[in-house]
Design a protein with these regions (language model features):
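Structural motif
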Residues: 24, 52-55, 184-188, 226
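Core catalytic region of metal-dependent phosphoesterases/phosphodiesterases
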Residues: 25, 30-132, 200-202, 209-213, ...
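Active-site-proximal loop/helix segment associated with metal-binding centers of metalloenzymes
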Residues: 112-113, 117-119, 128, 132-207
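Binuclear metal-dependent phosphoesterase catalytic core
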Residues: 131-133, 214-219, 230-251
Length: 251
């Protein structure tokens, strides 16, 4: 497995066959300009066999439905993303409209279940393991909004930002069924130890989730872990990487 900033296109193997690549990047917050060659080097060469995973705060399904202007703008942005040849996958962050996301159609995807947002855009459920291009990828979105006091419930903040009991149970069951062995972990926030290594203090409101991720870090065998949320691009350890603008591949 290889993890690097995306740049040169390694699209063909030694026999000249097209190679499928899984790319990973951080929070996009509904910014359509992120999905271009300037901000994602090599993006213009990605094809229908390629996948891009966003580590939460996708942000293109955010506006309350009664905000007609914002909804029109979001539909236009999603229309543009649906024209991309590659598949866009994302875990939930904390700045998402969970009511709208959870009403999306649930479909089988890569051995798990996902929410279909558009024909090529899917929300990956919490606590699932997806097998994508031969890689077992465990997903656990969500985080606590430290700015929730500035937000309006069900207009700019939703309580489903943190996992519920069912999602924790699903995660534990799924990991145990996989003998606690995966290739890649994708989350929005990070384990408590990693948060401290970034120079932050774990928020007590978030401790159930960050504590669970701490357990995952110690109990699960994994090769790479990517997370967003903290708006920094940093290789925290040899195996764990904070993502924001950088694009990494996990061929």
């Amino acid at each position: 497995m290889r993890a690097r900033k995306c740049g040169s296109s390694g699209r063909n193997d030694k026999e000249g066959e097209v190679v499928s690549v899984i790319y990973v990047s951080g929070d996009t917050h509904g910014e359509i300009g992120r999905f271009c060659e300037r901000n994602m080097p090599g993006e213009s060469t990605w094809g229908e066999q390629d996948k891009l995973i966003i580590c939460g705060d996708f942000g293109f399904v955010f506006a309350p439905e009664e905000y007609e202007g914002a909804m029109r703008q979001e539909r236009w942005k999603l229309d543009q993303l649906e024209k991309k040849p590659y598949q866009i996958l994302f875990v939930s962050g904390n700045h998402e409209n969970f009511e709208r996301l959870q009403r999306a159609e649930q479909v089988p995807l890569y051995g798990g279940t996902a929410f279909r947002i558009r024909s090529n855009i899917f929300l990956l459920r919490r606590g699932e393991i997806y097998e994508i291009e031969g890689k077992k990828i465990f997903t656990m979105g969500g985080a606590y909004s430290i700015d929730r006091h500035m937000r309006i419930p069900y207009q700019s903040w939703w309580p489903q930002e943190l996992p519920d009991e069912e999602e924790y149970h699903r995660a534990i069951r799924t990991l145990e069924e996989a003998d606690k062995i995966v290739d890649v972990i994708i989350t929005h926030t990070a384990p408590q130890t990693i948060i401290r290594m970034l120079g932050h203090v774990p928020d007590p409101h978030d401790q159930e989730l960050t504590g669970f991720l701490e357990w995952v870090m110690h109990e699960v065998h994994f090769r790479k872990w990517y997370f967003g949320h903290w708006h920094v691009d940093q290789e925290v350890t040899l195996k764990i990487t904070a993502c924001w603008f950088d694009v990494h591949d996990i061929m």
